[in-house]
């Protein structure tokens, strides 16, 4: 199953890479976002899978027009990346009693 999932991610990324190598240089820099829409699409597919990644890329590409100001627009974190990790150091800091000073 993992091989199928990887293959499904590789195919659209290969098409995007062909665009980046052969078509984009002919058009020149046009994207109003950072990272560019094609880089965003590759990263979205890698982080979120083919279906959700293509959906995120489609939304991003639909915003890439002169009426939108553009700017920095990173790929959102995947659900597993957004969960806070169980970090014993941060837990110990949160569980320490606070000192109160009386005046």
Curated annotation (Swiss-Prot):
Keywords (A to Z) from UniProt: Cell inner membrane, Cell membrane, Membrane
Positions of the UniProt region annotated as Disordered: 68-103
Entry GO CC: plasma membrane
Subcellular location, record wording: Cell inner membrane
InterPro entries xref list: Membr_insert_effic_factor_YidD (IPR002696)
Polar residues: compositionally biased ranges: 87-103
Pfam families recorded: YidD
Main location: membrane
SMART domains reported in the protein's UniProt record: Haemolytic (SM01234)
Topology in membrane: Peripheral membrane protein
The family this protein is said to belong to: Belongs to the UPF0161 family.
Record's function text: Could be involved in insertion of integral membrane proteins into the membrane.
NCBIfam families recorded: membrane protein insertion efficiency factor YidD (TIGR00278)
Name listed for the protein in its UniProt record: Putative membrane protein insertion efficiency factor
Organism of derivation: Idiomarina loihiensis (strain ATCC BAA-735 / DSM 15497 / L2-TR)
């Amino acid at each position: 199953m993992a091989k199928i999932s990887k293959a499904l991610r590789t195919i659209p990324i290969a098409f995007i890479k062909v665009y980046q190598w052969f078509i984009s240089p002919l058009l020149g820099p046009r994207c109003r976002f950072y990272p560019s829409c094609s880089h965003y699409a590759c990263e979205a597919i890698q982080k979120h899978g083919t279906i959700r990644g293509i959906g995120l890329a489609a939304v991003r590409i639909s915003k890439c027009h002169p009426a939108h100001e553009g700017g920095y627009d990173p790929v959102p974190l995947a659900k597993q990346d957004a969960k806070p990790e169980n970090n014993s150091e941060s837990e110990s800091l949160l569980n320490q009693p606070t000192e109160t000073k009386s005046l």
